[in-house]
């Protein structure tokens, strides 16, 4: 709460299990009233997963979607029903490489899945009523999920919520409703202490912006590569790009592997390449990839 600037503002921080995927279920259970409705923004695979889980609970309104464009942009022009019990969005989309740069002004409670960019940039986190994030991108190992919840929005759904899925139960038991994943929570604590020592979110944000700027500049400069998503929606966490000529793929793949890079193949549903630049990645690693891209350009001439 300290790092998010939410201390003393009526929020509780929970360390739960089940990954962010379980929150797809817990959010409607706790917030959608019987005969109520919820509004969702569909910006990618994880957003559509959350929508799927919400539908059995009641009317689930998809206010906008970029699915028909293969999620290459973040929809901007949409309205949120004023009678919705909450509005759900996904701040960063790992597979497609898009990121929300602004969030709608609404009187409806706002729920945000920040699994892949939590603690990466400064935001007014008090605009959100629930923030949830799987630990395994920017916070710690897989096994625990951070849920930050504004207490005043709970207890209004009128549902008989199973205890293990009830935020109020987890708050009353201080995240120990059942045996917590102690090692995952402990290592997350160490990561958050590391982040605080780097100047908090504002400190790491500068590093993340520098890393992303370095890679996107090369993607745009190098005639062998092209970016996949709308420029204004590019993610600082996940850069997606492709080769303009697939004839270079075998050479490029051999070059980046030889340079010690791993895991930049794009998701199987998208193809191409995806370079993930989470908080722990140093800018030197990004420079190695940029150098390989420049090398490929030279060898292709």
Predicted regions and their residues:
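Active-site C-terminal subdomain of aminotransferase-like
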Residues: 135-216, 230, 299-301
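Conserved active-site segment immediately N-terminal to the catalytic lysine
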Residues: 111, 125-136
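Substrate-binding/gating loop at the entrance of the active-site cleft, primarily
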Residues: 18, 42-57
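Active-site phosphate-binding strand-loop segment of PLP-dependent enzymes
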Residues: 54, 65-118
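Conserved beta-loop-alpha segment that forms the PLP phosphate-binding cup at the N-terminus of a helix
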Residues: 10-35, 47-49
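Conserved PLP-binding catalytic core of the aspartate aminotransferase-like
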Residues: 225-255
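PLP-dependent enzyme catalytic core of the Aspartate aminotransferase-like
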Residues: 271-301
């Amino acid at each position: 709460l300290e790092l998010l600037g939410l201390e003393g503002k009526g929020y509780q921080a929970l360390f739960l299990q089940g990954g962010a995927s379980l929150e797809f279920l817990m959010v409607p259970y706790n917030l959608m009233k019987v005969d109520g409705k919820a509004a969702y923004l569909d910006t990618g695979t994880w957003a559509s997963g959350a929508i799927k889980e919400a539908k059995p609970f009641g009317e689930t309104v998809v206010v906008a979607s970029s699915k028909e464009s293969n999620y290459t942009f973040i929809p901007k022009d949409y309205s949120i029903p004023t009678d919705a019990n909450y509005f759900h969005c996904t701040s960063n989309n790992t597979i497609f490489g898009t990121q929300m740069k602004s969030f709608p002004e609404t009187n409806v409670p706002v729920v945000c899945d920040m699994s892949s960019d939590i603690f990466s940039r400064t935001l007014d986190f008090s605009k959100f009523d629930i923030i949830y994030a799987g630990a395994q991108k920017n916070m710690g190992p897989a096994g625990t999920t951070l849920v930050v919840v504004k207490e005043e929005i709970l207890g209004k759904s009128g549902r008989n919520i199973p205890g293990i899925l009830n935020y109020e139960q987890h708050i009353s038991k201080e995240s120990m409703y059942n045996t917590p994943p102690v090692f995952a929570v402990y290592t997350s604590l160490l990561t958050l202490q590391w982040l605080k020592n780097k100047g908090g979110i504002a400190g790491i944000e500068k590093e993340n912006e520098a890393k992303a700027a370095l890679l996107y500049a090369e993607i745009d400069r190098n005639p062998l590569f092209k970016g996949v998503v709308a420029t204004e929606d590019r993610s600082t966490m996940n850069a997606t790009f492709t080769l303009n000529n697939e004839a270079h793929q075998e050479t490029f793949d051999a070059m980046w592997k030889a340079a010690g890079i791993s895991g930049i193949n794009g998701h199987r549903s998208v193809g191409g390449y995806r370079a993930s630049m989470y908080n722990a990645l140093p800018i030197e690693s990004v420079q190695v990839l940029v150098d390989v891209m420049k090398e490929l350009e030279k060898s292709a001439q």
